[in-house]
Amino acid sequence: MDMNADPRATKWTRREALSMLGMGAAAAALPRGASAVPSFPEGAVIRTILKDYPPEELGGGATLFHEHMSLAPDFLLRFRQYAADAQAVNRPPNAPQPAGQGGTVPPPDLSFMRDLGLLTEELAIAKREGIACIVDGGHADMGRDIGWLRQLSLSSGMPIVAGGGFYTQPFYPREIGTMSEEQVFQALMEQAQADPIGAFGEVGSWDYMTKDERKVFRAIGRAHLATNIPIFTHTGIPGKSALEQLDILEDVGVDPKHVVIGHLGNLVDPNTEVHRAICQRGAFVGFDRQGGPNDDPVVPIVMSLIDAGYADHLLFSSDFSNASALKRNNKELGYAKTLTVFVPKVKKAGASDEVLRQIMNDNPRRFLAFVPKVKRKV
């Protein structure tokens, strides 16, 4: 999960963020060609936890495609332990344990994700700063609570898209190992009918893909084909399984335009070979741990892709999971930090307002919009 540093050197004001997004009086100076306006299939919706929106109705601000507002209190403790165990497998004998791993450093406190008043305030601020919609990337095996997210959306006024699926091998329910692909597929269909799921995600691989993770990915691909619900993924750092994930989804018939391969800001490759391959195949590249100290090596990668003509395949978000980044604890951050901290760095590197508006406003709506195939059980 993300950590954060002081970003004040490039942080945008609320007015600057709203201007870039085409909101407020300052937006009049930012022309937008008709060819740049996204189009959506007839009957398409963005499914939020409270209702289905026509995608055009969420065009008044940025959409964050991967954040967290509902995780189990022990999620990061388990996350760190699994990471430490994975590193131990490849660690040379007698080598020191990496800093921050194991039981000596406590994980970030997630109790804020059970504080309705606090998160209501945080999301209301994010909305004022230009965020129109947020995708919660959790699901049951991460401790996501649908009822809690519904309360939070009602109290804050923020449209929230709920994720669905299964996370990664270490977090799978025990029965996944003995279930067939067909049984996993049926479980996903039950999720999609029982809950207002607007995306399958974050779903992924912990490191190199396991047999169970491949099985789950095939089932998720099939569930997408049966529902049209889009997919966003988690890749093991630094993106070892990115292309394999896309291969599996394509092999079962998924059109890549409905897929985001996530955490690719962690893949620091000046040649951007994997990033470009994903764009060329029609999927989105997710830079979704942004708005903090990991931004600097990511900005040149983003600019390389923009300069190569791939702006329409890029998505930004922050994978929010740290109380230190709350507005209450750091006035420079908050849930809008992708927009107010990372995006200004990309603009400073040479990206135009038009391109940034496309990435923050248009692309996520194009990704999330789908024509429902399955009627939900009410």
What kind of region is each of these model predictions?
Residues 68-114, 164-177, 181-182, 318-343:
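Active-site gating loops and adjacent loop-to-helix segments of metal-dependent hydrolytic enzymes
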Residues 147-150, 174-175, 210-215, 238-253, ...:
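Distinct, well-ordered alpha-helical segments
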Residues 232-234, 288-290, 310-332:
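Short acidic/histidine-rich active-site segments
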Residues 58, 65, 78-138, 142-158, ...:
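Alpha-helical scaffold segments that flank or form the walls of functional sites
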Residues 31-56:
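C-terminal segment of N-terminal export signals and the immediately downstream linker at the start
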Residues 12-30:
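N-terminal export leaders
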Residues 133, 151-155, 159-230, 281-284, ...:
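Active-site gating/metal-coordination segments in enzymes
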Residues 1-12:
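N-terminal secretory signal peptides
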